[in-house]
Amino acid sequence: MHKIFSLILFLFPIHLVFIKIKNFLYDNNIIDPIKIDTKIISIGNVSLGGAGKTPFTIALSNFLKEKRGFSVGVVTRGYGRRNSHHNFLFNNHSWQDCGDEVIVLTNNLSRSIPVYISSNKILGAKELSSLGCDIVIL
């Protein structure tokens, strides 16, 4: 535990430098931000699996759709899938094609919530935005 804490303490200032550089580049219009014509909610954290991101995504998506009336779409990487295609999930996909997390999502999301599988979350968000989604959850 001590070694991990020491590593974090060492890397944290380096991380801050990169954040400052990134912010400088955006603030001075050296690089342009990516524009997507819908609201984006990014669910994530530093930890790996088991942090509750998938159940929270399901609960939030269903709440926004059913209780608030928003058109919601979900983008997922499809971790563990065998291919690297970018596509919408349809009922005839197996967990090998899309990853087991995606099967959990689609089995628990409202049927009218589209799920886009892609390692390129920008592409997925743009695809869902073009479908008319008010909110895209990453």
Enumerate the predicted regions with their spans.
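A transmembrane-helix-recognition feature enriched in membrane-embedded lipid enzymes
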Residues: M1-K39
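P-loop/Walker-type NTP enzyme "switch/lid" segment
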Residues: T76-L138
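Charged, low-complexity, helix/coiled-coil-prone segments
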Residues: M1-F10, I40-G52, A125, S129
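Residue-level signal for inorganic ion chemistry
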Residues: I14, T54, L105
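Walker A (P-loop) phosphate-binding motif
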Residues: N23-N91
